[in-house]
Amino acid sequence: MASQYQLEFEKPVFELEQKIQELADIAGDNVELKTEVVKLEKKVDKMREVIFANLSRWQMVQVARHIDRPFTLDYLTHIFTDFVELHGDRLFGDDHAIVGGMAKLDGEPVMVIGHQKGRDTKEKVYRNFGMPNPEGYRKALRLMEMAERFRMPIITFVDTPGAYPGIGAEERGQAEAIARNLREMAALTVPIIVVITGEGGSGGALAIAVGDRVLMLEYSIYAVISPEGCAAILWSDGTKGAQAAEALKLTAPDLKELDVIDEIVKEPLGGAHRDHETMAKNLHEALARHLKELKALSVEQLVEGRYQKFRKMSRFAE
């Protein structure tokens, strides 16, 4: 699917694509024009390849936030079957910023949980812009505990700017809900695979991201704070997001080098927003492969491996 939403650095490509479309519309049976269209299409692919091979960290932030990137429900449609959504935390309410339920991956029952954003204004408000309240994290934990009870592997999709910072969320125990999830996920005895699909925003992301394997899509980001938030704190200037992005080391290659993640999942040329099906196919292969490896481990190996994985992240160099 070709997105109509343009990123600034993609404009030369979009302009050429418009010219190609105009040529194609008038080409008819004209062989010369058809040949020219084919040449220009190859040129577009080459331009996009060069652009995306040289993205700055700030440009990757923009791609990760692209409104047409696939969200959790899109992956559920393309990768899983027999999805049954489960609602509510049994304490306060149902948070629409987190979706989850039972599904099948290649015929095997799994529990799928993920952040869910919206695309139009109505849906964005309904999903609270992908920022969960405490009841969202408590719903996620309820489903994880259910998965453990029924011995179902857990797969989570992370894509959030962060946990919702509203007064109501704080009154209902936002910090406690996140902290409890971190503690409980670390001790679960079933395989957990985490996928960072877009924005991995601080504790709001980590609350469903303690896993045996952590995968990141090629142009996703994962950090302790947004670049704009970091810039506002360090330099009292939120417009210095590009500078902060460089300092945060928030891209998939950065985090693979630091051993924070286990694998970078290749995106289609131009990003996941351009081709949901190919992105889902690539991710499906990675999920199936990692799940097979994790199922071969004993419970003791799973829990100890997960513990050691997160313990070694606190390295620093002088």
UniProtKB/Swiss-Prot annotation:
Pathway(s) served: Lipid metabolism; malonyl-CoA biosynthesis; malonyl-CoA from acetyl-CoA: step 1/1
Database matches in InterPro entries: Acetyl_CoA_COase_a_su, ClpP/crotonase-like_dom_sf, COA_CT_C
Origin superkingdom: Bacteria
A single MF term (Gene Ontology): carboxyl- or carbamoyltransferase activity
Subunit and interaction comment: Acetyl-CoA carboxylase is a heterohexamer composed of biotin carboxyl carrier protein (AccB), biotin carboxylase (AccC) and two subunits each of ACCase subunit alpha (AccA) and ACCase subunit beta (AccD).
Subcellular location as annotated: Cytoplasm
UniProt-listed GO biological process terms: fatty acid biosynthetic process; malonyl-CoA biosynthetic process
GO cellular component: acetyl-CoA carboxylase complex
Chain's role: Component of the acetyl coenzyme A carboxylase (ACC) complex. First, biotin carboxylase catalyzes the carboxylation of biotin on its carrier protein (BCCP) and then the CO(2) group is transferred by the carboxyltransferase to acetyl-CoA to form malonyl-CoA.
CoA carboxyltransferase C-terminal domain residues: 39-293
EC class (word): transferase
Keyword flag Transferase: yes
Organism: Geobacter metallireducens (strain ATCC 53774 / DSM 7210 / GS-15)
Major site of localization recorded for this protein: cytoplasm
Protein name: Acetyl-coenzyme A carboxylase carboxyl transferase subunit alpha
Keyword Aminoacyl-tRNA synthetase found: no
